[in-house]
Amino acid sequence: MTSTEWRTGLTGAQQAEIRALIDAATTHDGVAPVGDQVLRELGRDRTRHLLTTDDDRVVGYLNLAPAEGDDPAMAELVVHPQARRRGIGAAMARTALAEGGPGARIWAHGNIAAAQAMASSLRLVVVRELLQMRRPLTDLPPVPDTPGVRIATYAGPGDDAEILRVNNAAFSWHPEQGGWTEHEIDERRNEGWFDPEGLFQAFDEQTGSLLGFHWTKIHDASLGEVYVVGVDPQAQGRGLGYTLTLIGLHHLAEKLAGPEPTVLLYVEADNSAAVNTYRKLGFEVFSVDAAYAAN
C-alpha cells in the first residue's frame, strides 16, 4: 500500500533511501533525475520533501523549493523504475504544483519519455529549457593573449567578495545563479570536488578589479564541467568569456586521466549568444532539461 506525506526534515535513514532511489533511477535512465542542489538539501530544512512509500520502502521523492520574490516554486522528482506506470509521479507532481502556488515548475532532467508522459497527463507545458552541451577534451584551440589582464587561481575567502560582485552582476537575471551570497560559495567550497586550482580569475592589471572568472568541476577521471563562467557586464566585448572558458578547458584536459576525457556545461536554450559561442568551441547538445508548468 502506498502513502505520500510532506516532510520538512529527513532522517539519516530516509536520506540514504532517497540517495539509493536516485542512483537506481540514474542507472536505469542514463541521466540523474535531480540536480546537485537537491542532494545538498536532503540534510537541510530549507526546502520541503514529499515522500511516497510502498510497504515502508521509499519509491518516490520530490523536492520543492519555495517561491522567492519573482522566482516561482521549483520541484524536482524521482520515481523508482520498478514503481513507474502506477501514477505515482503524476500524483506527486500534482501535489507539488498545488502546494507551490502560481507558476510552480517541475524540472525533468533529460526530459525522458516517462517525464514527457507525466507532463502530458497533467497538461503541463515546457516553460524553460536547459541544454547540456559536451565536447571531447582533445584538439583544443590555443588560449588567446589577453593584454592588460592577469590570470590567477582562487587564493581563498579573500577573493569571495569580488567573485560575488561579478557573479551577481553577470547573472542578475538568472533564478538559480543570481543573488548569490557567501553562503553559496561556502557550500561549494565544502564539496569534495572543490579545487582552488580549478577556479580561474581574470583581473584588470591596472585597477586590480575582477573582470571575470571560470569555475571548473571534475566529476570523475573522464568527465569535467564548465561549472560557472561569469564576466562583469562592464567588461564584456573583450573576449574574456571565450578566453576564460579555454583556460578552464586546458586545465581539465591536463587533470583528467580517463581514456576519453570529456567536458560538459549547462546553458539556457534561449541564450543564443552563449549557445553559439559554445558551438564555436566545439560543444554540441548532449541532452535537454525541461521545466514544466501548468498551461
UniProtKB/Swiss-Prot annotation:
<feature type="binding site">
    <location>
        <position position="36"/>
    </location>
    <ligand>
        <name>1D-myo-inositol 2-(L-cysteinylamino)-2-deoxy-alpha-D-glucopyranoside</name>
    </ligand>
</feature>
<dbReference type="GO" id="GO:0008999">
    <property type="term" value="F:protein-N-terminal-alanine acetyltransferase activity"/>
</dbReference>
<keyword id="KW-0012">Acyltransferase</keyword>
<dbReference type="InterPro" id="IPR017813">
    <property type="entry name" value="Mycothiol_AcTrfase"/>
</dbReference>
<feature type="binding site">
    <location>
        <position position="176"/>
    </location>
    <ligand>
        <name>1D-myo-inositol 2-(L-cysteinylamino)-2-deoxy-alpha-D-glucopyranoside</name>
    </ligand>
</feature>
<protein>
    <recommendedName>
        <fullName>Mycothiol acetyltransferase</fullName>
        <ecNumber>2.3.1.189</ecNumber>
    </recommendedName>
</protein>
<feature type="binding site">
    <location>
        <position position="225"/>
    </location>
    <ligand>
        <name>1D-myo-inositol 2-(L-cysteinylamino)-2-deoxy-alpha-D-glucopyranoside</name>
    </ligand>
</feature>
<dbReference type="GO" id="GO:0010125">
    <property type="term" value="P:mycothiol biosynthetic process"/>
</dbReference>
<comment type="subunit">
    <text>Monomer.</text>
</comment>
<keyword id="KW-0677">Repeat</keyword>
<feature type="binding site">
    <location>
        <begin position="236"/>
        <end position="242"/>
    </location>
    <ligand>
        <name>acetyl-CoA 2</name>
    </ligand>
</feature>
<dbReference type="InterPro" id="IPR016181">
    <property type="entry name" value="Acyl_CoA_acyltransferase"/>
</dbReference>
<feature type="binding site">
    <location>
        <begin position="229"/>
        <end position="231"/>
    </location>
    <ligand>
        <name>acetyl-CoA 2</name>
    </ligand>
</feature>
<feature type="binding site">
    <location>
        <begin position="85"/>
        <end position="90"/>
    </location>
    <ligand>
        <name>acetyl-CoA 1</name>
    </ligand>
</feature>
<feature type="domain" description="N-acetyltransferase 2">
    <location>
        <begin position="149"/>
        <end position="295"/>
    </location>
</feature>
<dbReference type="Pfam" id="PF00583">
    <property type="entry name" value="Acetyltransf_1"/>
</dbReference>
<dbReference type="InterPro" id="IPR000182">
    <property type="entry name" value="GNAT_dom"/>
</dbReference>
<comment type="function">
    <text>Catalyzes the transfer of acetyl from acetyl-CoA to desacetylmycothiol (Cys-GlcN-Ins) to form mycothiol.</text>
</comment>
<dbReference type="InterPro" id="IPR050276">
    <property type="entry name" value="MshD_Acetyltransferase"/>
</dbReference>
<feature type="binding site">
    <location>
        <position position="266"/>
    </location>
    <ligand>
        <name>1D-myo-inositol 2-(L-cysteinylamino)-2-deoxy-alpha-D-glucopyranoside</name>
    </ligand>
</feature>
<feature type="binding site">
    <location>
        <position position="217"/>
    </location>
    <ligand>
        <name>1D-myo-inositol 2-(L-cysteinylamino)-2-deoxy-alpha-D-glucopyranoside</name>
    </ligand>
</feature>
<dbReference type="GO" id="GO:0035447">
    <property type="term" value="F:mycothiol synthase activity"/>
</dbReference>
<comment type="similarity">
    <text>Belongs to the acetyltransferase family. MshD subfamily.</text>
</comment>
<feature type="domain" description="N-acetyltransferase 1">
    <location>
        <begin position="4"/>
        <end position="138"/>
    </location>
</feature>
<feature type="binding site">
    <location>
        <begin position="271"/>
        <end position="276"/>
    </location>
    <ligand>
        <name>acetyl-CoA 2</name>
    </ligand>
</feature>
<keyword id="KW-0808">Transferase</keyword>
<feature type="binding site">
    <location>
        <begin position="77"/>
        <end position="79"/>
    </location>
    <ligand>
        <name>acetyl-CoA 1</name>
    </ligand>
</feature>
